[in-house]
Amino acid sequence: MAGHSKWANIKHRKERQDAKKGKIFTKWIRELTVAARQGGGDPGSNPRLRLALDKALGANMTRDTIDRAVARGVGASDGDDVEELGYEGYGPGGVAVMVETMTDNRNRTAAAVRHAFTKCGGNLGTDGSVAYLFDRKGQISFAAGVDEDSLIEAAMEADADDVVTNDDGSIDVFTSFSGFYAVRNALEAAGFMAADAEIVMLPTTSAVLDLETAEKVLKLIDMLEDLDDVQNVYSNAEIPDEVMEQLG
């Protein structure tokens, strides 16, 4: 499963851009609201809300802002309904792209996503057109310096799918979608505190890009991520390190 680290360069680039754009608060406010609406306002009994709460606190969101988002989700405050919608399509070079959104106006969001695909030389597809190329997984990440052997042993005992050690020494533990929270809790109980933990869409196949195509694909990803309603963008693009270095 070491191949999953191929997409780390795009992910890290995305995280830097999220912070730069100041979009991260909006993203987690929406996730808090939807998580609370679906599973209730108690993070102790709502694992999705607990994960969103951890992310929001990690982004230095104030407790007051968090509480308002949760209250909106459980119906304690007024506000337009926010729903989760997914979009699928192909970008330049035949790269498969999945877009996760949260929106209070599906027509606005669909039009904006379609425009991004069209402008960047891609095509917005129908439901299922590229979803079969991805698996929904849990990814629990640990910073370099953690005891690798002990972490691997604890992860396997917790029924994790695999453990990947990256070039920088950080370690990713991958889980099934359904087993994500149980594995995360088991690792915490064993004394391993994650640097990050999230549900992701991992590609089962990859499209290796040259410099020209990589520029076009990243332009599409940037344009999609700039949309206010977009939460996450996943692709099966594999950009070799030497190409990523040329991109800067």
Swiss-Prot record:
Q: Name one Pfam family in it.
A: TACO1_YebC_N
Give a GO molecular function annotation for the protein: DNA binding
| GO BP terms | regulation of DNA-templated transcription
**SUPFAM superfamilies per record:** YebC-like
Chief location bin: cytoplasm
Q: Which InterPro entries match?
A: Integrase-like_N, TACO1_YebC-like_2nd/3rd_dom, TACO1_YebC_N, Transcrip_reg_TACO1-like, Transcrip_reg_TACO1-like_dom3, YebC-like
Q: Does the keyword DNA-binding apply?
A: yes
Q: Which cysteines are joined by disulfide bonds?
A: none
Q: Which GO terms describe its cellular component?
A: cytosol
Q: Does the keyword Transcription apply?
A: yes
Ordered alphabetically, the record's keywords are:
Cytoplasm, DNA-binding, Transcription, Transcription regulation
From the Swiss-Prot or TrEMBL record, state where the protein is found: Cytoplasm
Give the UniProt family note: Belongs to the TACO1 family.
Q: Which NCBIfam families match?
A: PRK00110.1 (NF001030), PRK12378.1 (NF009044), YebC/PmpR family DNA-binding transcriptional regulator (TIGR01033)
Q: What is this protein called?
A: Probable transcriptional regulatory protein PSPTO_3980
Q: Which organism is it from?
A: Pseudomonas syringae pv. tomato (strain ATCC BAA-871 / DC3000)
